[in-house]
Amino acid sequence: MTIALTGGGTGGHLAIVRCLLESAIKKNIECVYIGSQNGQDKAWFENEVRFKEKFFLSSKGVVNQSKFDKISSLLHTLKLSKDCREIFKKYHIQAVFSVGGYSAAPASFAALFSHLPLFIHEQNSKSGSLNMLLKPFATKFFSAFEKEISPYPVADKFFDNARIRKELKNIIFLGGSQGAQFINELALNLAPKLQEQNIKIIHQCGKNDFEKCKKHYQSLNIQADIFDFSLNLEEKMKNADLAISRAGASTLFELCANTLPTIFIPYPYAAKNHQYFNAKFLQDQALCQIFMQNSINLDEFFKSILKLNLENISTRLQNITQKNGADMLIQKALFDNLTFIR
């Protein structure tokens, strides 16, 4: 069997693609990847040899575009979907699995036009525009946030490095794969207070702010573990006892898998405020704290860091997600629904 995996744009979407690829390989399913020249798709998968083939199309997002540009983008997407249909024919694609993001649009529409099963994984608590549009036509729609809960695909390495946290010795600041200026500034402002408490700092700051953050820590004579980006983030997480993080869905569930207590600062400009609702999923279970970016008081924030019951939260995070989530999605989509697959 050969399937197409499509979608991306950001690290969160692409992490799911990688999990699905690894699970498909276990079942001897070959995968063709269809992504975009824009975003992070090529950086993640251009050299990924486990795909049967990879295609990076000229797809682009429509968020914040004018009405005319949105129409133009839609017409371009329809043109690219025709190219995808040719890819489906050439590689005998039997089903399409979308993880969302604008780079999923051409192949997803092509699946509908070609009468192929379309499976969609929605990573966020608030569905993106493309997934909302396609959901009624999908063969199966998966979400970790809906009533019929599906496991969120998280790489095994985050579970393998999990441990119960009991004492705050190390704190990690996570701004996402591209860094977050606000979280970087927060980390630098908190650094002297953390040093007074003998709390060590691990800081993912992104490429743009790396030199600035490095020099600031040096000026404070603080030995922070600072890095711009890491493909082995689980190695950094396992050394931390608390995380300060944005609330992208993949990051959130990776933190859960690692049983790492977290204070979330949702990105305030995320579409439909989905990062806040992602974090609220945990807050409603008393499993995290949320601070809104525009109302943070440094002293109050620091007090919250020291007050968290790390052991209680870390222990209960074990029940939020489960290992082999991607395996379950592949099983549900392609084997429990064999009548859909020609």
Curated annotation (Swiss-Prot):
GO CC terms: plasma membrane
Keyword entries, A-Z: Cell cycle, Cell division, Cell inner membrane, Cell membrane, Cell shape, Cell wall biogenesis/degradation, Glycosyltransferase, Membrane, Peptidoglycan synthesis, Transferase
GO terms under biological process: carbohydrate metabolic process; cell division; cell wall organization; lipid glycosylation; peptidoglycan biosynthetic process; regulation of cell shape
Membrane topology: Peripheral membrane protein
SUPFAM superfamilies: UDP-Glycosyltransferase/glycogen phosphorylase
Record: residues binding UDP-N-acetyl-alpha-D-glucosamine: T10, G11, G12, N124, S177, Q275
Enzyme nomenclature, EC number: 2.4.1.227
Any one Pfam family match given in the protein's UniProt record, by short name: Glyco_tran_28_C
Record pathway: Cell wall biogenesis; peptidoglycan biosynthesis
Top-level class of the enzyme under EC nomenclature: transferase
Cell inner membrane keyword on record: yes
Catalytic activity: di-trans,octa-cis-undecaprenyl diphospho-N-acetyl-alpha-D-muramoyl-L-alanyl-D-glutamyl-meso-2,6-diaminopimeloyl-D-alanyl-D-alanine + UDP-N-acetyl-alpha-D-glucosamine = di-trans,octa-cis-undecaprenyl diphospho-[N-acetyl-alpha-D-glucosaminyl-(1->4)]-N-acetyl-alpha-D-muramoyl-L-alanyl-D-glutamyl-meso-2,6-diaminopimeloyl-D-alanyl-D-alanine + UDP + H(+)
Role summary: Cell wall formation. Catalyzes the transfer of a GlcNAc subunit on undecaprenyl-pyrophosphoryl-MurNAc-pentapeptide (lipid intermediate I) to form undecaprenyl-pyrophosphoryl-MurNAc-(pentapeptide)GlcNAc (lipid intermediate II).
Entry's family note: Belongs to the glycosyltransferase 28 family. MurG subfamily.
PANTHER family hit by this protein: GLYCOSYLTRANSFERASE, UDP-N-ACETYLGLUCOSAMINE--N-ACETYLMURAMYL-(PENTAPEPTIDE) PYROPHOSPHORYL-UNDECAPRENOL N-ACETYLGLUCOSAMINE TRANSFERASE 1
Protein name: UDP-N-acetylglucosamine--N-acetylmuramyl-(pentapeptide) pyrophosphoryl-undecaprenol N-acetylglucosamine transferase
Species whose genome carries this gene: Campylobacter jejuni subsp. jejuni serotype O:2 (strain ATCC 700819 / NCTC 11168)
UniProt lineage: Bacteria, Pseudomonadati, Campylobacterota, Epsilonproteobacteria, Campylobacterales
Designated gene of the protein: murG
